[in-house]
């Protein structure tokens, strides 16, 4: 039984994880979950704020303090804003404005090493992870991506080579963060993407 500590106590974000209980504190958790909400403040990744960015620096700093206490035997999982936050904490940047992703419906994500494997997942975001050329000693792997849905990529110098949807961050080949851009908590329990994500988490922790 996995113990999940939901940062900020928005416990419904973890409901899609099978066979889990809510941890009351960080120390006892197997999984530390960072959830959705406001945009991450660009000051955390050294950029100027785009006019469309709405951030809460107090929340960012509180969650940064939690992230810095996470042990090497714990897995961080980020959902939507949480995925972007984990990108930043691992030295990445954010694309501050994209189109055709804040649909409040679903869109398709594609497995990076097997493009015949595709899933539908709920999408509500206007920002996006930019894990390319990480500034820290962290490696990343884009596990799933979206086919260039956006008409523009505002807030970065170069467009992304793909639109990252699920990114795994590792340190010395050890998984440390699983960043999920979509909203699995908004999907039906029987949706294929839920089984895929649970299988992935089982492999990582």
Regions found by a protein language model. Give the residues of each.
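Catalytic nucleophile loop
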Residues: 83
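N-terminal beta1-alpha1 cap of cysteine-dependent amidohydrolase-like domains
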Residues: 1-79, 88-95, 99-126, 130-173, ...
